[in-house]
Amino acid sequence: MVEPAGTALVGVAVWGQNLYNSWRPRKVGIYGAAMVGKTTLDRYMTTPGEMEEIPDEERTGHMRLLGKYLLPKPTRKRISWKGDRRVVFSADLGGQERFWSLWIDDMVARQVEVVVYMFDERAFKGGDEALQQIAGFKYLVDCIINRQYRYRTLKSRWKGKKYVPRLIMLVANKADRFFDENAAMLWQQNRIGEHKVFDPFRDDLVRLQKAGVPSRRSFMATRIGWNVETTLIDLLST
């Protein structure tokens, strides 16, 4: 028989943990190649709702100063889903190859605890777009494993020497374009990591595991708001 006092203490502890998770600011880095949905996710986290297809001319870019691209400042978002809440600070970074070094600068300078790498169905269709998405993840993994960080300040250099993100989340975005019967079955069985959409990234996921960096996988469809809040709240509860 469970003692009432013990039950009450457990309830208070759970309530306290939920309250802590609801208000603690979480630093999240959202990276990925061009046109995979990073800006859509950034806008959706800021204000959920019906999202437009972002035109090419509005793709994220960055100004240069003295030969360096300027890092955008992170903005605060508040994510809510069925009573759970999280406060997230993230920045919208470009996905073109010339901006990849900014991912690392942002990650190290802010000491992000969770990295979300986004890709879409083009990654397993071949061609230049697939190569960019796969190469972007490999670049990110190389930098994390080998700690090939660039430091913009002495403070970031001091912090970066021992820095490794707590978790890497590989997100297959635009799931509405590839979610088939097999995906539905794997989803129900909590085995989505076995879906073929993740095949191009498996070697680098293994490298992360061997290096002691945990990784997870998920589906999203940011433009229609499917599985966005669920994924992020679950990610920030671990």
Residue ranges: model-predicted function:
Residues 46-87:
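Switch I (effector-binding) loop of TRAFAC-class P-loop GTPase G-domains
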Residues 83-103:
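Switch II (G3) loop of P-loop NTPases
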Residues 36-37, 96-98, 121-126, 175-179, ...:
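Short acidic, S/G/P-rich loop/turn micro-motifs used as interaction or catalytic elements
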Residues 114, 119-209:
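Conserved C-terminal guanine-recognition region of P-loop GTPase G domains, centered on the G4
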